[in-house]
A protein has these predicted regions:
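Juxtamembrane helix-boundary/capping and inter-helix hinge elements in multi-pass membrane proteins
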Residues: 61-63, 75-79, 98, 155-159, ...
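Core transmembrane alpha-helical segments of multi-pass membrane transporters/permeases
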Residues: 44, 48, 56, 67-103, ...
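Alpha-helical transmembrane segments of multi-pass membrane proteins
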Residues: 85, 116-129, 155-172, 328-341, ...
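Juxtamembrane and boundary regions of transmembrane helices in multi-pass small-molecule transporters
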Residues: 2-3, 38, 167-170, 174-229, ...
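Hydrophobic alpha-helical transmembrane segments of multi-pass integral membrane proteins
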Residues: 83-93, 112-146, 319-359, 376
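Hydrophobic transmembrane alpha-helices of multi-pass small-molecule transporters
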Residues: 1-87, 199-295, 434
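Short helix-coil transition sites and intra-membrane helix breaks within transmembrane domains
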Residues: 60, 81, 93-102, 118, ...
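Membrane-interfacial loop-to-helix junctions in multi-pass transporters
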Residues: 76-82, 107-124, 151-161, 229-237, ...
Length: 434
């Protein structure tokens, strides 16, 4: 039986080795601009073309060896662990939705809002819900219709009210233990989610408090008649299980598995779902992660060929000429993920794309991996939160019947965490991790 040798060595640093990444970014960006829709162009196709290009330009190996080298990158243990987590996260999210856990969490949050603290309350609701469910899009879909209706009743500016939810949604997108961005950032940097959370939370907390304070100030004088929401307390349990076990430091796969079990127990006990319907929900959730899994595999393979051909070494070599210590390295990491996010309109993909490069930079300059993971996640959320063609902005604008461009000027939280991210770099904050 013939065995194909896998080469783990790299060639001399080469600018040409980076061309597959440039092909991907240019292809996806240019084609998206032509059709004027960043979500009609399949990102999987862009990765497929750039992957084929990467295989074609790889020299010194037979075609079979090139494909095997590509496959080695796709089968990297960190990539595979990310995929297993994506599968579990998809199963949990869909089953939680189908048993009514999302609606229960939303209603509980809304019932607790006092009228004169409506703005601050919705910001907190968006923060809590996104932290619980790990998705900013889900938070936007759940809350924007409600806050849009309130805006109509109170005469408040629709764009301003919508921006409250969009901004708050990125609090959880940035920090949640089950967020794709958190998973991608921690896996590519090789640090624990709990440790990344501690650093990331210290960076963004001041921004969250300032924005919250502003909403409290703006909320005084508002007179909104209270509404009664039906709260099904037991259906909140799956999210509480996820939050509590995550904060206790359980393995993320175990956290999600316990959450999945909780959705089944709660759904069956309350009669919200039958056993086979629950199985169907789990299957639908896992299948729904298919595109992200394919993208992750192809990104891993393409980046392995870039590494093998000397592309990573070239970037490190060029950046190290101008980087002065940890501060410069952290700025570079933030810039890398920000640029990738502008081109892909997807913060998870941006992190997956540049994460390995950021990890190399962090290693070379002694940047704490908890800090580099936080920088990756925070800068990606900043860009995703303000680009008008991001999924969150497009969804919010559609639900509120306004233009995405109208929302941007009121996105105080994404702007705030950008300021704090830059402050954390130049002021060396938090001190312990800088």
């Amino acid at each position: 039986m013939n065995k194909t040798k896998i080469n783990s060595n790299t060639k001399q640093p080469s600018l040409w080795a980076l061309s597959p990444l440039l092909v991907f970014l240019c292809l996806y960006l240019v084609v998206s601009l032509i059709v004027n829709d960043f979500y009609k162009v399949p990102i999987t196709v862009a990765f497929l073309i750039s992957s084929v290009f990467a295989i074609c330009i790889t020299k010194g190996l037979s075609l079979n060896e090139r494909v095997m080298q590509y496959s080695q990158g796709a089968a990297n243990k960190n990539v595979m662990l990310m995929i297993w987590i994506f599968v579990l996260a998809g199963a949990f999210a869909q089953s939680a939705k189908d048993i009514g856990a999302i609606d229960a969490t939303v209603n509980l949050t809304l019932q607790l809002l006092p009228g004169n603290l409506l703005l601050a309350g919705f910001f907190l609701a968006a923060c809590f819900i996104s932290l619980s469910i790990g998705t900013s899009v889900g938070t936007v879909v759940a809350l924007v219709p409600v806050i849009a209706g309130i805006a109509e009743k109170t005469g408040m500016d629709m764009a301003f009210m919508t921006a409250i939810v969009v901004g708050g949604a990125f609090f959880g997108d940035n920090l949640s233990f089950i967020s794709d961005t958190t998973i991608a950032a921690t896996r590519t940097q090789g640090c624990a989610m709990r440790d990344k959370f501690k650093v990331n939370f210290r960076i963004v907390l001041p921004a969250a408090l300032v924005v919250l304070g502003y909403y409290i100030y703006r909320g005084f004088g508002m007179d909104v008649p209270p509404e009664s929401y039906t709260i099904e307390w037991v259906k909140v349990l799956p999210y509480l299980v996820v939050l509590v076990t995550a904060f206790m430091g359980f393995n993320v796969a175990l956290v999600l598995l316990l959450g999945i079990i909780a959705t089944g127990v709660v759904g069956l006990c309350t009669g919200s779902i039958g056993i086979f319907d629950w199985f169907g929900s789990l299957g639908t959730g896992m299948s729904g992660m298919g595109e992200l899994i394919i993208i992750t595999l192809m990104a891993g393979g393409m980046l392995e060929l870039i590494r093998f051909n000397g592309g990573v070494d070239y970037i490190i070599q060029v950046l190290t000429r101008k980087i002065n210590g940890k501060k410069g390295a952290e700025v570079c990491i933030g810039a890398l993920v920000a640029i990738a996010n502008v081109c892909t309109a997807n913060n998870t993909i941006a992190i997956i794309t540049v994460g390995p490069l950021a990890n190399d930079i962090a290693t070379k300059y002694g940047v704490d991996k908890r800090k580099s993971a936080s920088i990756l996640d925070t800068f990606s959320c900043v860009i995703q939160g303000i680009i008008p063609y991001g999924a969150q902005m497009l969804m919010a604008a559609k639900l509120a019947s306004i233009s995405p461009l109208n929302i941007i000027e009121y996105l105080y939280y994404p702007m705030g965490i950008f300021i704090m991210a830059m402050f954390s770099i130049f002021a060396r904050w938090p001190k312990k991790y800088s």
